[in-house]
């Protein structure tokens, strides 16, 4: 009787996206050491990759990820840089006098670290029919990556949340529509969603 070898399981964690999902949407912070333990003990992950931007001078976060590296994680960090979003011009017409007033509104800054590139390169290099990947992100920019690694025979679990935020003037889902489309396009069992909500009691940070 021929038995198939168990597949190697790796985790790739988009730290910013995952942390934002649990904090803003689900109301809890992740203890990254607990998550690492859960992935290695419960899910039998042989490799766990963390990708994170770190603000210049943020020694506390830098030390935390050094500690994860010491525990056995593969940690890749980049310095966060900021760039200004284009200002928005609003034109308001006075009903009484008919005069048009133009106001320039600052839209603030975006913060990027370009860790997506590192995650993409590592995942493509590691992919193969003998692997299963847990990819922690809800970011639609990873739709093409997921297609490619599935084509290489790798089973993919997308770890995020399908929950949404509903407020007056705001109705948004954390899991990108593009990722949902990728899941629909593939046969059942090739790409599955794991709702990180269900892991809360195992991975949340005590505050």
Where in the sequence are the language-model features?
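Domain-level signal for Mg2+-assisted phosphodiester chemistry and nucleotide/NA-binding surfaces
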Residues: 1-107, 150-151, 155, 161-165
């Amino acid at each position: 009787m021929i038995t198939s070898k168990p597949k190697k399981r790796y985790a790739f964690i988009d730290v910013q996206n995952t942390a934002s999902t649990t904090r803003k949407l689900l109301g809890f912070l992740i203890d990254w050491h607990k998550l690492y333990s859960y992935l290695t003990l419960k899910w039998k992950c042989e490799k766990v990759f963390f990708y994170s931007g770190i603000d210049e001078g943020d020694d506390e976060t830098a030390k935390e990820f050094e500690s994860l590296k010491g525990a056995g994680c593969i940690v890749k960090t980049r310095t966060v840089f900021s760039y200004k979003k284009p200002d928005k011009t609003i034109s308001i017409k006075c009903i009484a006098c008919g005069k048009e007033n133009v106001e320039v509104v600052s839209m603030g800054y975006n913060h990027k670290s370009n860790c997506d590139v590192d995650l993409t390169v590592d995942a493509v290099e590691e992919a193969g029919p003998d692997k299963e990947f847990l990819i922690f992100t809800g970011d639609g920019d990873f739709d093409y990556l997921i297609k490619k690694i599935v084509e290489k025979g790798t089973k993919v679990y997308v770890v995020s949340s399908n929950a949404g935020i509903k407020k007056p003037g705001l109705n948004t889902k954390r899991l990108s529509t593009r990722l949902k489309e990728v899941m629909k396009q593939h046969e059942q069992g090739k790409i599955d969603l794991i709702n990180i909500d269900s892991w809360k009691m195992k991975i949340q940070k005590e505050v």
